[in-house]
Amino acid sequence: MTEDLPGLIRHFAGQKQKVFFVHFRDVFGDRHHFIETFHDEGPTDMYACMRAYAEAGFNGPLRPDHVPALEGETNDSFGYTNLGRLFAIGYISGLREAAYGRHPTNYRSA
């Protein structure tokens, strides 16, 4: 949706210090018509975004936003399935560990 999302993150989370809470997700499409994807399936370089948060010194809460359903889930609570959320948390944790470093005091869990 933007050509330089990591640059925007560094600007607003770092220089402006205007990011206080992050809903982390990826989508296909534009702001009018989009489909939410798993964090590792969309067009965005999610690691570059996480690295931008780290470089900006962001230390606030970060959580997955809506997630697609995995095989076997009913999707009764669209966007909030248990297995999809577990996958997202694991993926985000890996990105965060890679971007911020392994030591748990380098970031605060969301």
Describe each region flagged by the PLM.
Residues M1-A110:
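Histidine-acidic metal/acid-base catalytic patches
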